[in-house]
Amino acid sequence: MDKLTVQDLSPEEKKVLVRVDFNVPMQDGKILDDIRIRSAMPTINYLLKKHAAVILMSHLGRPKGQGFQEEYSLQPVVDVLEGYLGHHVPLAPDCVGEVARQAVAQLSPGRVLLLENLRFHIGEEHPEKDPTFAAELSSYGDFYVNDAFGTSHRKHASVYVVPQAFPGRAAAGLLMEKELEFLGRHLLTSPKRPFTAILGGAKISSKIGVIEALLNQVDYLLLAGGMGFTFLQALGKSLGNSLVEKSALDLARNVLKIAKSRNVTIVLPSDVKAAENLQSKEYSVISIDQGIPPHLQGFDIGPRTTEEFIRIINQSATVFWNGPVGVYEVPPFDSGSIAIANALGNHPSAVTVVGGGDAAAVVALAGCSTKVSHVSTGGGASLEFLEQGFLPGTEVLSPSKS
C-alpha cells in the first residue's frame, strides 16, 4: 500500500485523532446493526495497546449543521462502544468549542474519548463555510487516522481538510487498509481470473460510471434488478409493468456495444418471478423470451437465471457484488439474492467482495457475512473507488515511507 498506515506511526503516549464511521442505522433510539462500530474496533484496540490517547470523531444521520439534536446524538454509540472496550467512554457534549477542548486535554493515554456528532456543525459538510471548524479539530491530535472508508468519497472537513494539517502523520486505519487492499489489489490492480461482477439495484444512471470502469476489468458482468430490466428493454424484450429506466435505454445499448468490443460476457435474466404487485400472494415464473404480460411486473430473478448466475460464480476466481437482484425485503422475492449470497459464501477458493449497502444486508440475512472474503463498509464509497481508483479521503493521507 502506498499510504502511511496506523502501524507505521509511533503513537505511544500521544493523542491520536481517529475519524471513524459510526453512522449506524437507528430506530427509536436503538442501534439496529452495530457492524460499523465492530469494524472500527481493531484500530481502536491497536492504538490502546500502544498506550495512545484515542479521540474518536464521527457523524450520525443528517442533522444538516443546525446544532445539537438529540435524535442524532452519538450517546447510543457510547453504550455499544463501552460494551466492546469494557470501560467507560466519555462523550464530549460537542466536537468543537471549550467543552471539547477540555475533554481532549483531560484524556489520558490508554483511554478513549468520543466527540459529539460532527454534522451538528455546518463546517463538517461545507468546510468552506466555516474554516475554523477543521482547524480546531486538527489541533486535538499529534496524529490523524482515517478508518471511515464509507465516508471517504466526500470532501468533508474531517476526512479531507483535517488530514492535510498532519503532513507525514496522516494514516489509514486497519479497516481502511483492508478496504483498499480488497477493492484496490484484488479487484482493480491484479484480480484473479475469471473475474465476475454482479450488479443489481434500480438504476443504470446511478451506476454508469462503475459499469464503464468494470468493463475494463471483468470477464463476466451479470446484471439484474431494475437495472437488468432496462437492459432487457434495450434489447426489445416485452417486460409488462416491470421497472424500466426509460431515460437510460441509450446508455444500456452503449454498454452492450462496449462489452462486445472488449469481449466481456454480459448475462441478463432469462426468467423472472412476476406478480401484479409486491402484496400478491402468488407469482408466476415467466421466461423473458415469452414476455411478461402487461399486468405483471418482475420482482426477482427466476430459477433458470439463478442457476446460470451460480454456475458462473462457481467457475470464477474473483467475484464482486453490488445491489440485490430482486426485492429481497419481501419474500418470496428474496430467493435470488439469498442464493447469490450463499454461492459467494460457500465458494471454496474465490476472492468474494460485497460492495456494501443492500448487498451487504442480503449477505447478513443469509448468514454469510463471515464466509465471504470481504464485506465493504461503504456502498457509495466502494463504487466510487472502483470507478476512480481513489477517494478524496484516501488521496490526502500521507505517503508510505517505504
From Swiss-Prot:
The gene is pgk. Its EC number is 2.7.2.3. Its main location: cytoplasm. Keywords: ATP-binding, Cytoplasm, Glycolysis, Kinase, Nucleotide-binding, Transferase. One of its GO terms (cellular component) is cytosol. Belongs to the phosphoglycerate kinase family. SUPFAM superfamilies: Phosphoglycerate kinase. GO terms for molecular function: ADP binding; ATP binding; phosphoglycerate kinase activity. Disulfide bonds: none annotated. Substrate binds at D21, F22, N23, R36, H59, L60, G61, R62, R119, R154. This is Phosphoglycerate kinase. It is an enzyme of class 2 (transferase). ATP binds at K207, G298, E329, G356, G357, D358, A359. Monomer. The keyword Transferase applies. The keyword ATP-binding applies. It catalyses: (2R)-3-phosphoglycerate + ATP = (2R)-3-phospho-glyceroyl phosphate + ADP.
